[in-house]
Amino acid sequence: MKADALWYEAASVVGITNALNVVADGLPADVLPPLEASAAGAEARAVLDDVRATYGEIPAPFLTLARDPGYLADLWGAVRRAFEDHELSRRLKEALAFAVSLTSRSRFGTALHLGQMRRLGVGPGGVMEITGVTQMFSSYTKIADTLQLEPDMGDIAPVDPSPAPGGPAGGA
């Protein structure tokens, strides 16, 4: 399992990014308006304070979920765990979440994770590189899906144990 730790960590970021995007894009403000942070109960405000400390703001989905402090706390706990530095850095995870959001056409997620990448020092060149790689892989995936291709790289592309970009410098 240790050899796959990076993949599990990345998969967690992908899943949690999707979950947050579903709330944000599926419950827009005209359907279920976000609360003002000051209108939330004490339990929800404590969570929202932690969200603000992490993001520098409180993204709308967290304010929407403030109506249900338990749900808010559960989702925030999952987001926080997924995006903390572990084997992969938060900066790399924000780039991955940006790519996931861009590919799934989540306006909320694309804006949130682009803003976080910028906060964490990713410049215009880095943003364009991530966008280009995302576009390329998304295009190839659509072509492969359309042609119903099966993966055939198992015997010629062995597992690479080296750390992913943003991972620990000395290897795992």
What are these regions (language model features)?
Residues 1-172:
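Hydrophobic alpha-helical segments
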